Amino acid sequence: MTRPRPPLGPAMAGAVDLSGIKQRAQQNAAASTDADRALSTPSGVTEITEANFEDEVIVRSDEVPVVVLLWSPRSEVCVDLLDTLSGLAAAAKGKWSLASVNVDVAPRVAQIFGVQAVPTVVALAAGQPISSFQGLQPADQLSRWVDSLLSATAGKLKGAASSEESTEVDPAVAQARQQLEDGDFVAARKSYQAILDANPGSVEAKAAIRQIEFLIRATAQRPDAVSVADSLSDDIDAAFAAADVQVLNQDVSAAFERLIALVRRTSGEERTRVRTRLIELFELFDPADPEVVAGRRNLANALY
């Protein structure tokens, strides 16, 4: 999920027009042999040039999410980010593809993305950007970001060819999805927990449980939670309830600012408690969401 509205919406939609490139790539792909396809998609990091951009980014993103890192070896931050993403890609074993664009070597590819600074990371699915961020991110946050990409695109792409994975949706997963869609949060939580118990690496189950737990809590809050919290400015529980309702109503920035203001007014265990809840709310969203980025920055300012 990330929001009660669709998660990982096209954060860069309209910023990069890849439709023409995608059309040409599909035409080229139709003329390629299976052997050529295998040779052009090695495991690990794929170095992108003008020559392979269409195949390895646009066409490949019809199969699995493609994370494009635009970087320069002259920057230590870029090198660190490449190392972290490379490790995540290796661990994913083909569930997503990491494409590396050295902007010093392939400046015209960088221009396609309108890069203003490096490192810049853009995730694509079905030939279109779906999320992006600039700068170095903590490893745990990058891992959650990748998880959110996989969750948001689950069942929507062709998938990489694999003898280990079936194209059919697991009946247990289908049931859990339907329960969540029907608003039966308790049943969906139980179903997803069973999936996670059987498969501890399930990206979808982890994300769904986190989201469902929020929805169960938020929908149980009193309707006037915001006005109550406004009248009790230092009541932590009231602030938590109000923030839940605000997030549920998609007034996300206001929810974040409410708790950040409380961080500024508290100390010790109380401050830790508020900070922990705020981070939990951040984790409901795409880490590259502008409201999350601003919220994390404001929280850091409030703490330090």
From Swiss-Prot:
InterPro entries: Thioredoxin-like_sf (IPR036249), Thioredoxin_domain (IPR013766), TPR-like_helical_dom_sf (IPR011990). PROSITE patterns: THIOREDOXIN_2. This is Uncharacterized protein Rv1324. CDD domains: ybbN. It holds the Pfam family Thioredoxin. Coiled coil: none annotated. It comes from Mycobacterium tuberculosis (strain ATCC 25618 / H37Rv). GO terms for biological process: cell redox homeostasis; response to stress. The keyword Signal applies. One of its GO terms (molecular function) is oxidoreductase activity. Residues 28-151 form the Thioredoxin domain. Residues 1-15 form the signal peptide. Keywords: Signal. The keyword Signal applies. One of its GO terms (cellular component) is peptidoglycan-based cell wall.
